Amino acid sequence: HLGSIRQYCFLFLTLQRRTYIINTPLKDNKIVYFLSNKHIILAEAIMGLGGINTESIYADIPFEELSSKLDILKQRYIDGNIPGLAERKERLKKLIDIVEDNSDAFGEAIQSDFGTRHQQISLLADVRSTLSFANYSYKNVSSWMQPEKRSPNFPLNLLGAKARVHYQPYGVVGIISPWNFPVNLSIGPLVDAFAAGNAAMIKLSEFVPRTSQLVENLIKENFSESEVVVINGAMQTSIDFTKLPFDHLIYTGSTDIAKKVSSEAAKNLVPLTLELGGKSPTIAVSYTHLRAHETHS
């Protein structure tokens, strides 16, 4: 599929206060659009795979080592030591600082990995969106932790019974992050996990090595391996990662791979959250290459 993806890019065009997202052929990274008789926009290709290395530079990590790291993460929850509000907010604040203080470094790493993706678009769509979500979670985590009242059923309601739901963390959440938004889809789920009081183990994409290495370095500098573990490894490591007995597993990627992930997770009865690729809506206008759209959209 990479061959067809390389021929296309997403362009965000703003005209008359309206934003159009157009999927269009890529030629020399630049395309001229005649949006009206008075408007000519030279748009730079901002999404693509021109610089993506489809061969991993990472070695595989033995399954026993992955399992040992998971055991360390799980031990805290086995001991019943659940993170409270103060600790959750501290973790979230660290993530906010990581993204905010290193936004330029993230942009440069993503640009280096992708080649054709404009750095400002990466900052907006991948980095700043992560920061916005982390700030939102930091502000709201206290209210999310509050117990919720429920009405007890008959006959307990006649006996003065009261019912409440107290939300508890799963324990250790596994996160499999794809290549297309390597910051948002790795740190974003980590924000979720931390806000809910979980620890996490993240498998980063081997296809964006500079960004993945930066994420790993920053996480290691700010968190202990009893809070979060970042894994960079080749294909077999990704396969072994899905075989680990997590308390919950988050996967973002293709439907075909998701079937394999689901199959492995089912062997350990691991609940899943899947965000899967699918249809990509396209706006076709009069000057669009319709035959190309029919083939690739």
Which residues fall in each region the model found?
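Short, positively charged and aromatic/hydrophobic N-terminal segments
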Residues: 14, 21-23, 30-36, 40-41
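N-terminal Rossmann-like NAD(P)+-binding subdomain of aldehyde/semialdehyde dehydrogenases
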Residues: 39, 43-162
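Aldehyde/semialdehyde dehydrogenase
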Residues: 48, 78-97, 236-260, 297
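Adenylate-forming
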Residues: 88, 288-289
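Rossmann-like NAD(P) dinucleotide-binding subdomain of oxidoreductase/dehydrogenase enzymes
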Residues: 153-287
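Single conserved hydrophobic/aromatic residue that forms the stacking wall/gate
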Residues: 289-297
